[in-house]
Structures are given as structure tokens and as C-alpha cells.
Curated annotation (Swiss-Prot):
PANTHER family per UniProt: ATP SYNTHASE DELTA CHAIN
HAMAP family hit by this protein: ATP_synth_delta_bact
InterPro entries with a match to the protein in the record: ATP_synth_OSCP/delta_N_sf, ATPase_OSCP/d_CS, ATPase_OSCP/dsu
Description of how the protein assembles with itself and partners: F-type ATPases have 2 components, F(1) - the catalytic core - and F(0) - the membrane proton channel. F(1) has five subunits: alpha(3), beta(3), gamma(1), delta(1), epsilon(1). F(0) has three main subunits: a(1), b(2) and c(10-14). The alpha and beta chains form an alternating ring which encloses part of the gamma chain. F(1) is attached to F(0) by a central stalk formed by the gamma and epsilon chains, while a peripheral stalk is formed by the delta and b chains.
One example GO MF annotation: proton-transporting ATP synthase activity, rotational mechanism
Keyword Signal: no
Function per UniProt: F(1)F(0) ATP synthase produces ATP from ADP in the presence of a proton or sodium gradient. F-type ATPases consist of two structural domains, F(1) containing the extramembraneous catalytic core and F(0) containing the membrane proton channel, linked together by a central stalk and a peripheral stalk. During catalysis, ATP synthesis in the catalytic domain of F(1) is coupled via a rotary mechanism of the central stalk subunits to proton translocation.
Gene (name only): atpH
Short name of any one Pfam family annotated for the protein: OSCP
Native source organism of the sequence: Haemophilus influenzae (strain PittEE)
Family membership: Belongs to the ATPase delta chain family.
Protein name per the record: ATP synthase subunit delta
Length: 177
């Protein structure tokens, strides 16, 4: 776990709890997503690492975000600036999204395949994973030619390696025993 994730966790939890309380999860997702995009800009990153006052840094981020931040979003930016944590805004957004997915019972599943998957294959994998996990899934599909053939499916809890590379590795391990 990275240091930024550790720093971001309490801010994300507080923002999520407040968003739930205010029935504004979608609004907060948009606000934090926009603020994270701003904070990830190279020029803004350099500015945030300067030795300017917290007030000046917060005012700058708030003015760049403009109307994308409501007063509560602005308060979060000010609080993070006072604590010298503005560089953690993208990590706060990522942690916030994890809270939202958990709240909505959505599991993130990473699917790595040797070749690009077609829509039918993606639907079948999604249906199988939803059945196995008993919750909705969000698939993130990647291509890795080194797999030779097949797929590797990763969730937070387990990995299913159905790739040719994985089968060859297991076979090699068996032969060495």
C-alpha cells in the first residue's frame, strides 16, 4: 500500500460518508474526479509542490476547478491544503471510488487476455464472475501477448489463470518435482 493511499483513506471515507448523508454520491464522484484530473496535470503538480501558503494553493486549485466544486468540495480542498495533502487528491478520488463500488456491491475484475476479447466473450466472463461473486462486476480488459493464449482473471480475492503461459509454468513446476 502506498503512502498516498494511506493519506487518502480518511479524506475519502469522510467525503463518502458525507456524500451518502447528503444523497450526493454522483455529485461527489464528479467533483473529486475533476479535482483529481486537475491535480494530475504536470503544471499543477509542480505548483502544488511549491512552498506557497496553504491558502494560496487551495485558492488556486479551487479557481481552476471553478464551478465543478460546490462549497463542500471547496472545503475539502482547503482542509487538504492546510494539512499539506493536496498532492493526494487523485488517491482520494480512487479511494472514494472504491467506497462507492463497495456500497453499490460492484466488484472490480481485471481480465488480461492474449488477444482482444469480443463483446460476446466479455459478456460471458462478466456473467460468470457475477454469478461466482454474487455481485455486479466491472471488467477492466487488457491485452498481454506474452500469455500466448487464454485469459487471466484477477479480483481482490483470487486469481484464475487460464492462460497457456500459466499452464506451461505449472507443467514445468510439476516436472521439476
Amino acid at each position: 500500500m502506498s503512502e498516498l493511499t494511506t493519506i487518502a483513506r480518511p479524506y475519502a471515507k469522510a467525503a463518502f460518508d458525507f456524500a451518502i448523508e447528503q444523497s450526493a454520491v454522483e455529485k461527489w464522484t464528479e467533483m473529486l474526479g475533476f479535482a483529481a484530473a486537475v491535480a494530475e496535470d504536470e503544471t499543477v503538480k509542480a505548483y502544488l509542490s511549491s512552498s506557497l501558503s496553504a491558502q494560496k494553493l487551495a485558492d488556486t486549485v479551487i479557481s481552476i476547478c471553478g464551478e465543478q466544486l460546490d462549497q463542500y468540495g471547496q472545503n475539502l480542498i482547503r482542509l487538504m491544503a492546510e494539512n499539506k495533502r493536496l498532492s493526494a487528491i487523485p488517491a482520494v478520488f480512487e479511494e472514494f471510488k472504491h467506497h462507492v463500488e463497495e456500497h453499490q456491491a460492484i466488484a472490480e475484475v481485471e481480465v488480461t487476455s492474449a488477444q482482444p476479447l469480443n463483446a460476446t466473450q466479455i459478456e460471458k466472463i462478466a456473467a460468470a464472475m457475477e454469478k461466482r461473486l454474487a455481485r455486479k462486476v466491472k471488467l477492466n480488459c487488457n491485452v498481454d501477448n506474452a500469455l500466448i493464449a487464454g485469459v487471466i482473471i484477477r479480483t481482490e480475492d483470487f486469481v484464475i489463470d487460464g492462460s497457456s503461459r500459466g499452464q506451461l509454468t505449472r507443467l514445468a513446476n510439476e516436472l521439476q518435482l
